Regions:
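Beta-strand elements of repeat-based all-beta scaffolds
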Residues: 1-13, 17-34, 38-55, 59-76, ...
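Short Gly/aromatic-enriched secondary-structure transition segments
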Residues: 461-463
Length: 478
């Protein structure tokens, strides 16, 4: 529904759930109220910039702007504050995040006359530098550790090579602009496409292929893995997943409401999981039902006016006869500060940047870049050390230390413990992990994988799939 000024004043979905909107005299939305009477309010300055958002719990986030209507600060209801600075051309010159007391973390940026980013300086002073071609494409990047990566492009400005200290990766494309291959010293990943540029096959470095099929709406119907097994998916007329069968023959079916929300899942063993929602679309009940139609367990949820879960009532009805009530409490920034489980309280605290400082069991510290530097609990303190690029290079725990190294692209390369256990990782040209070699060379079984014996080594081979997942297999020998 719209008012005389064509402002939206009510939106009602197919389930007859509605949200109402109110506008000021300048046709700016100032209030949004759902069917449960949970409201969010908005404030503006004379230029039309949004200066505040007030959530359903009356917690206010405030925004300020400069004379050019650029955001210069954001402050949440707990006092956590971010500031933004700009250069004379309007580029972001710096951001500052304020912590406790006088502590603040500032990141600065410098640009060339064309507006290309030249340097980025972290709060701890480490610098990343860039060079560009005349069209603005990055030619070189030197990270905080001094590692350089160089890029080249074709006439259509597609990256065709990437060179770093670990070698050169090359990339090829078809006439439609789809990447058909990515090659480096570890082999080639090849991609095949249909006339609609949908990926139909991915062939990995080891020659194995994963194949994909689609329906007329371009929904993916099947994935056939290198071992010949497939995962198949069916869809309804709206494109929602209706059923899926896994490679081992197990499957799941989905029943949905008019809004596309799952209200029932059917499992291969005959059991089901049912879901209910409130008028705001939030989950209010999850119920697990056995094949014989007995309720195994159910969980009911309630929410505050800002949409935070305030209670979780877990009950085992017929089989798992255990009831448990969990209550949740939040601060003005909607951060969880206390849980109560059957009368037992756990408290949480945060710094102004939102980092967890304590959780009732452990305390935590962070550096200016919000990286965890220590965790202290009843067993002692674990410390974390990072290189200039932010990679974790050492974890020192009370029971021993683990050290890590990285590739030129800052991907984890090795991890080694004090007692001689190690893992070495290999990546393809797309920086996807394709191999993990694990080694144990002494009698200490402290952190070993359960299927690796003393004095043995194991290898995980991971084939890259086009959706970012992997087909995995393991070999090991003594």
């Amino acid at each position: 529904q719209y008012d005389a000024n064509n402002n939206l004043i009510q939106n009602t979905n197919r389930s007859n759930e509605w949200v109402k909107y109110a506008d000021d005299c300048m046709n700016r939305q100032v209030k949004e109220t759902n069917q449960l009477n949970h409201a969010t309010e908005y404030e503006y300055d004379l230029a039309g910039n949004q200066t505040a958002v007030i959530d359903g719990n009356k917690n206010k986030t405030v925004y300020t702007y400069d004379g050019l209507n650029r955001l210069v600060s954001k402050t949440n209801a707990e006092g956590g504050m971010f500031e933004y600075r700009y250069d004379s051309f309007g580029n972001t010159a710096g951001t500052t995040m304020y912590g406790g007391g006088d502590e603040k973390a500032t990141t600065t940026y410098a640009y060339d006359a064309a507006g290309n980013l030249l340097t980025e300086t972290s709060p701890l002073g480490s610098v990343t530098t860039y060079t560009h071609d005349k069209e603005g494409h990055v030619l070189t990047q030197v990270d905080e550790n001094g590692k350089q990566t160089a890029y080249t492009y074709d006439k259509l400005y597609r990256m065709v090579s990437r060179k770093d200290a670990d070698g050169t990766a090359t990339f090829a494309y078809d006439k439609a602009g789809n990447m058909t291959s990515a090659k480096d010293g570890n082999g080639t990943v090849a991609f095949a496409f249909d006339a609609l540029s949908r990926t139909t096959a991915v062939t990995n470095e080891d020659g194995t292929t994963t194949a994909y099929t689609y329906d007329a709406a371009s929904n993916r119907l099947s994935i056939t893995y290198p071992d010949g097994k497939a995962v198949t998916t069916a869809y309804d007329s709206l494109g929602n997943v209706k059923s899926q069968t896994d490679h081992d023959g197990t499957g799941i079916t989905y029943t949905r409401d008019a809004e596309g929300r799952t209200i029932k899942e059917g499992h291969s063993d005959g059991s089901t999981t049912e879901y209910d929602y409130n008028a705001a679309g939030l989950l209010t009940l999850q119920k697990e039902v056995t094949k014989s139609n007995s309720t195994r367990r159910q969980t009911a949820y309630t929410y505050d006016d800002a949409g935070n879960i305030v209670s979780e009532n877990r009950s085992g009805v017929d089989i798992d006869k255990k009831d448990e009530l969990v209550r949740y409490y939040y601060d003005k920034a909607n951060q969880l500060i206390r849980t109560n489980i059957e009368g037992k309280n756990t408290k949480y605290s945060y710094d102004l940047a939102g980092n967890l400082l304590s959780d009732g069991t452990n305390t935590y510290t962070y550096d200016l870049q919000n990286r965890l530097t220590s965790k202290t609990g009843k067993d002692g303190t674990t410390t974390y050390t990072y290189d200039a690029a932010g990679n974790l290079i050492k974890k020192a725990a009370p029971d021993g230390a683990t050290e890590y190294t990285y590739t030129a692209q800052n991907k984890l390369k090795t991890g080694k413990t004090e007692d001689g256990q190690s893992s070495t990782y290999t990546y393809n040209a797309l920086n996807a992990r394709i191999k993990n070699v694990q080694v144990r060379d002494n009698k200490n079984a402290g952190h070993a994988n359960s299927d690796l014996k003393d004095g043995s080594h194991g290898t995980d081979y991971l084939d890259f799939l086009m959706d970012g997942r992997f087909f995995w297999q393991r070999t090991w020998e003594t």
